[in-house]
């Protein structure tokens, strides 16, 4: 995104750098929020929708913004594309503060920002090709060039044979692919995805997220994903911003937030994604056998396997009875529930030492 006061609008064409499918890609947009506040007024009452927002989204990255309903996620996105303006603060896109720009300049700027939505927002009266071509028609792109661009985009999103189909003939996943193709039509450097997968089933969600990864990987576009599903963040994002009541309560790499959440809100979201702590029924069944049960958060650098070796050396029987370990941003991470059975006083002492060591290094909970 150009940082000049008068951003230019280039018309992409097949075969040019930055055109869809070109592995050299586009340079993504850097986004910086500085002390951003948004206040809505309802009569004499003030509603602080955003409060003291400070964050930086690196160019070419994928960031997930997560929070419960009313947290301020969608309001934040509307500040980025200028559909709403903050009460105070700065929003810099590649170093250019967009807050004071007149609407005429913001319209030009929006051609560099793609948007996909939960409900797809396709024109039912236009076929797939017509929907994808719509922003190009608004730009005044010549018909032949427009048709080439649409063909290229449909191939990129895996819908080469659907150009003449109408939205009512498509599945939810196919509709969202059309939405992504349309969002890419003007060759943006920034893509905003507002709850783009929340209306889709899990399998289709995975397919759409893989397509967004392809967009980021091959085109270099910065992607901001608004969601209330931590699994979406886990699957696609480089970093995560956790919002609550209009504030950023936590932010960091996905691995950092997953492995060591600092707030209750973040911890609750992480728990919904991992789902590897025994529920009440499972816990009762596990407690029917001898031994003590511990659920341990696995992360690198906690000395877990050394601690397990010490337990075994003390004659403690160690069984993994629940959970699993996965790879997250090239780090091992997960939760394991262990049954530790001591057969001597030394074994009981070793279990206490294990518990103490894990408390100092990670999260551990004894299931009683």
From Swiss-Prot:
The lineage of its organism: Bacteria, Bacillati, Actinomycetota, Actinomycetes, Mycobacteriales. ATP binds at residues 67-74. It is found in: Cell membrane. It catalyses: L-methionine(out) + ATP + H2O = L-methionine(in) + ADP + phosphate + H(+); D-methionine(out) + ATP + H2O = D-methionine(in) + ADP + phosphate + H(+). Residues 1-14 have a biased composition (Polar residues). One of its GO terms (molecular function) is ATP hydrolysis activity. Residues 31-270 form the ABC transporter domain. Pfam families: ABC_tran, NIL. It comes from Corynebacterium jeikeium (strain K411). InterPro entries: AAA+_ATPase, ABC_transporter-like_ATP-bd, ABC_transporter-like_CS, ACT-like_dom_sf, MetN_ABC, MetN_ABC_transporter-like, NIL_domain, P-loop_NTPase. PROSITE patterns: ABC_TRANSPORTER_1, ABC_TRANSPORTER_2, METN. It is a peripheral membrane protein. This is Methionine import ATP-binding protein MetN. The keyword Nucleotide-binding applies.
């Amino acid at each position: 995104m150009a940082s000049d006061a008068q951003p230019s609008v280039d018309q992409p064409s097949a075969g040019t750098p930055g055109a869809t499918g070109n592995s050299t890609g586009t340079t993504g947009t850097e986004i910086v929020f500085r002390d951003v506040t948004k206040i809505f007024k309802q009569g004499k009452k003030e509603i602080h929708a955003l409060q003291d927002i400070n964050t930086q989204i690196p160019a070419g990255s994928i960031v997930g913004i997560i929070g419960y309903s009313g947290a301020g996620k969608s309001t934040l996105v509307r500040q980025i594309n200028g559909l709403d303006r903050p009460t105070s603060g700065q929003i810099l896109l590649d170093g250019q503060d967009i807050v004071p720009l007149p609407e005429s300049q913001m319209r030009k700027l929006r051609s560099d920002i793609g948007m996909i939505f939960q409900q797809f927002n396709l024109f039912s009266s236009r076929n797939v090709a017509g929907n994808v071509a719509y922003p190009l028609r608004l730009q005044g792109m010549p018909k032949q060039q427009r048709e080439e661009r649409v063909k290229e985009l449909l191939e990129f999103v895996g819908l080469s044979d659907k150009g003449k189909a109408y939205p009512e003939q498509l599945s939810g996943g196919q509709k969202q692919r059309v939405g992504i193709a349309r969002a890419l039509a003007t060759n943006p450097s920034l893509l905003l995805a507002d709850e783009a997968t929340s209306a889709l089933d899990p399998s289709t969600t995975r397919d759409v997220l893989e397509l967004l990864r392809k967009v980021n990987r091959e085109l270099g576009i910065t992607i901001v994903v608004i969601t209330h599903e931590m699994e979406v963040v886990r699957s696609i994002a480089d970093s995560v911003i956790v919002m609550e009541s209009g504030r950023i309560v936590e932010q960091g790499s996905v691995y950092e937030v997953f492995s060591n959440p600092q707030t209750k809100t973040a911890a609750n979201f992480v728990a919904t994604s991992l789902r590897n702590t025994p529920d009440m029924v499972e816990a009762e069944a596990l407690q029917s056998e001898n031994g003590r049960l511990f659920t341990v958060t696995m992360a690198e650098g906690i000395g877990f396997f050394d601690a397990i070796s010490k337990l075994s050396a003390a004659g403690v029987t160690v069984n993994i009875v629940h959970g699993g370990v996965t790879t997250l941003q090239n780090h091992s991470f997960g939760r394991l529930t262990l049954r530790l059975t001591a057969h001597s006083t030394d074994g009981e002492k070793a279990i206490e030492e294990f518990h103490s060591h894990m408390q100092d290094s990670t999260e551990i909970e004894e299931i009683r």
